Amino acid sequence: MYKRQLRWQAAVFGFSAHTLDVRQNSEVVTRVLENIWSINGTFHEIGSEGWLQQVKSELIEPNLPILDKSELNDESFEILSRLELIFKIQNGPDPDAVGPFILSMTRSAADIFSVLLLARYAGFGSEKLSLKVVPLFETIEDLDKAPDILRQVYDFPIAARSLKDADGFMEIMLGYSDSNKDGGFLCSSWTLDKAQRAIARSLSENGVKPKFFHGRGGSVSRGGAPTDLAIAAQPKGTLNGTLRLTAQGEVVTSKYANVGTAATQLELLSSSVLHHSGLTNVSAVDPEAEDVMEALSSLSQLSYLNLVNHDDFVSYFNEASPVDELSLIHISEPTRLLA
C-alpha cells in the first residue's frame, strides 16, 4: 500500500513536488537586450519601430552572434544565467520543476519578443522555443492594449509556435493590484472583465484558447473575493476548464494553514471551475448594460484620480490610517512598493 501511494505521488508531483515560476519585469529584459546590442554593435531607440524590427530579425536569424558573457554587466549576466539554468532543467530528469517565464509590466509585443530573443541567446532552439512566456498585463492602458498585442504576437510565426502549448492554450496573467491603483476598484474590475473577453476573441482568431492566471490578493482592492463567487463572475468563454490564481499573504494562512481547510478550498476551487466551465446558458453582456458600465467606469476613474492626485491626499492618508504602524509588522509584503 505504501509503495502504491509513493508511485501515485511520484506520477502526480514528479520529484520536485511543485513547479517554480520565473518572473521578471519587461524593463529589465529591455535593459539586458540593450546591453547585449551595445556590445555586438548598434541598435535603435528603445520602443521605436526600428527596435521592434531588430528584435524580430534577430529572433528568426538561424545563427546568432556568439555572446561572451564576461562582457555583460551584472544584471545581464544574471538574467542570461537564469535562462540557461531554465534550459538545463527543462532538459533534465524533472522538466516540470520550472514553470513559465512571467513577464510583468508587458506593454508591447516587442517585450514578449525580447524575452524569446534572450532565450535564444541562452541556448534555446531557433524554430520553436520551449520557454513559455506569460505576459502580465497590469495597468488599465496595458489591459486595453492586450488583445492587439497578442494579435501581433500570433502574426509572428516563431512566437506563435513557441507560446501556444500542446493543448492549444496560451497563458495570460492579469494584474488586479496595479490596475486598481491605476483606475480605482470599479474601473479596474470592468477593465479586467472587458480585457478577458477581448483577449479570448483575439486568441480564437488564431485557434488558441486562453488560460487566465489571476494575480489576486487578499483584500478587495487587490481583487480578493470568495472563491466560488470570483469564479462565477468570470466572463463567458474565459474559463475553458482551467484557471490559475495567486494566494498571497494572509490568504495562505486563512485558506491553506491545515489539511482540512486546504482540502476544502481546493475542492471548492476545482468544482467551481468545472461547474462554470460547463454552463451553456450563460448570456452575453447586454449592449445597453455594457454602455452603462462603460460610463460608470469612466466616471469612477475620474473621481478616483481626482482624489489620489489631490495635493493633500498623501498627508491625509498618513494621518488618517495606521500605515506607519503597519510598516513595523513583518508580514508578507512591504508596506510601500517603490516604482
Feature-to-residue mapping (PLM):
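Single conserved hydrophobic/aromatic residue that forms the stacking wall/gate
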Residues: 1-2, 329-339
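Catalytic cores of glycan-processing enzymes that make or break glycosidic bonds
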Residues: 3-11, 18, 113, 171-181, ...
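Extended, charge-enriched "interface" segments that sit outside catalytic cores
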Residues: 3-92
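Short coil/turn segments at secondary-structure boundaries
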Residues: 3-7, 19-24, 96-103, 163-166, ...
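Glycine-rich, often proline-containing surface loops adjacent to acidic residues and nearby aromatics
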Residues: 16, 55-69, 92-100, 129-134, ...
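C-terminal amphipathic alpha-helical interaction region
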Residues: 66-87, 91-94, 101-115, 126, ...
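Catalytic or ion-translocation cores adjacent to nucleophile or general acid/base/metal-coordination motifs
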Residues: 122-302
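Active-site phosphate/pyrophosphate-binding segments
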Residues: 292-300, 307-327
